Amino acid sequence: MDLQGIKIGSKKGYSTGYRLLSLAIAFVITAVLLFALQPEAEGSPVAIWPYVEKEAQEAGLDPHFVYAIAFAESSLDPFADSGRARGVMQLKKVAWQTVTELPYAYAWDWQTNIKVGIAYLNFCKQILIKDRTFSYPMLAAAYRYGPTAVKNKGYNLANIDRPSNKIYRQILSGKTGYIQGVQYPILTASYVN
């Protein structure tokens, strides 16, 4: 058989062309597998989870809660843009400016966005603690609607409009730990209630 000048399967055994073709195919397959199996591609769920876990713990927040908020807000898309909010944590400009002096353009950097999102969660948490109304469902409502809106509803979750987002509905109903619909990068027993 002649494949563009490379003889394959000659009577004397494999030709040099066939060996080179086999090596090239093996090299391409190896390169593709190595690229596909990179565990921490920038902004991937596998990279985002350890970052959220570290930053949330340092800030005194439940990492599973923060990860679920990020997933609910953007499906972990670093370039998510609702027209009003940006990045993984879907931060609005006013929320961003409440907790940082960094330019809002930095909201496109997924690590900065998560860090500022956690700072805003802590800002909301401190308001709720001061008003003796802190709970993770209330914190989710304050993050989604703003702490003033939650206060105006008497800190009563029953008075707050239920979002269409299934993840937020679970969180606002008091579910913690593993949240159905959140795609965790590695599912372990610690995620399950």
Model-inferred region functions:
Residues 134-193:
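Catalytic and substrate-binding regions of cell-wall glycan-acting enzymes that process beta-1,4-linked
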Residues 93-152:
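Alpha-helical segment that forms one wall of the substrate-binding/catalytic cleft
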Residues 58-62, 82, 133-135:
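Extracellular/periplasmic catalytic domains that process cell-envelope and extracellular macromolecules
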Residues 1-5:
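N-terminal intrinsically disordered, acidic low-complexity segments at the extreme N-terminus
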Residues 7-27:
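N-terminal Sec-pathway targeting helices
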Residues 52, 56, 69-97, 146-148:
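Cell-wall polysaccharide-cleaving catalytic domain and substrate-binding groove, primarily
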Residues 65-66, 87, 135, 139:
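Residue-level detector of well-ordered alpha-helical segments, enriched
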Residues 26-76, 111-114, 122, 126-129, ...:
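Export/targeting segments at the very N-terminus of extracytoplasmic proteins
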